[in-house]
Each structure stands twice: as C-alpha cells, then as structure tokens.
Amino acid sequence: MAKKITAVIKLALQAGKANPAPPVGPALGQHGVNIMAFCKEYNARTQDKAGFVIPVEISVFEDRSFTFITKTPPASVLITKAAGIAKGSGDSAKGQAGSINRAQLEEIAKTKLPDLNCNNIESAMKVIAGTARNMGVSVSD
C-alpha cells in the first residue's frame, strides 16, 4: 500500500546552499521532517546549478519520510542572467531594462520546457518572450 501524503511544501532555495535556518527549518520542522537529511540531499542534487534559485516541491508522508522534486529555475532569473541585468524594469511599458536575442530566448525555452505547460519549443519561446516583455526586456532577432 502506498504511503499517505500529509503535506506538500513548496520552497525556492539557492542551489547547493540549503541549511536548517529559515525558511527551510520552520517549514520542514512543523511537519516533523529530518531537516538535515533534506538539506544534504538537496545540496547534493543541486550542486551543479550553483548561482540559481531552484524551486523544490517536498512531499511529506505520514511516517515523516519525504521525497522532493526540483524544478527548473524561474524564467525571470534565467532572463536576467541572459540579459546581464540585476533586475527587470519597474515599469515595463515605459522603460527597457535590457535585451536578449532569439538564440538566448530559445536556450531559456529549452531549459524551462519540462516545467511549462507547452508541448513544443515554439510555444515555450512565446511564453518566455511574454515573461521577458513583462520584465522590460526586449527580444531582438
């Protein structure tokens, strides 16, 4: 018989830098999860993605065991890295924060494809282009 899930916790943590301090400790501690075991496993899985914020979805079971799934970095983080800017424009209608080219857009779309609600790369590129536009980042050919 399958174990019953008691909680699903969603966190966004720096890759390879999870520690028992907030927000990890309180979020996992209230469900009785072994915090250090999670931190070690998360850091081992995300070691190669250093510098990115990696969202994680933790499923906690009745017996206090857990499993987790790491997602791809948020599109906004990938766009700011590609454009070489610190953050997007405060008012995307008036000011441009930077620009990315079509090749960079395609690379970001390929990275995000597993987490997007898309079936092909063209529709994923449209989703990422919309995110870039909302951040004040233009997409050039």
Swiss-Prot record:
One family from Pfam that matches here is Ribosomal_L11_N
Tell me its family.
Belongs to the universal ribosomal protein uL11 family.
Designated name of the protein: Large ribosomal subunit protein uL11
Species of origin reads Prochlorococcus marinus (strain SARG / CCMP1375 / SS120)
Q: How does it assemble?
A: Part of the ribosomal stalk of the 50S ribosomal subunit. Interacts with L10 and the large rRNA to form the base of the stalk. L10 forms an elongated spine to which L12 dimers bind in a sequential fashion forming a multimeric L10(L12)X complex.
GO biological process annotations for this chain's record? Answer: translation
> What does the entry list under GO cellular component?
cytosolic large ribosomal subunit
Could you tell me the gene encoding this protein? rplK
Q: How is it modified after translation?
A: One or more lysine residues are methylated.
Entry-linked InterPro entries: Ribosomal_uL11, Ribosomal_uL11_bac-typ, Ribosomal_uL11_C, Ribosomal_uL11_C_sf, Ribosomal_uL11_CS, Ribosomal_uL11_N, Ribosomal_uL11_N_sf
NCBIfam families the UniProt entry points to: L11_bact
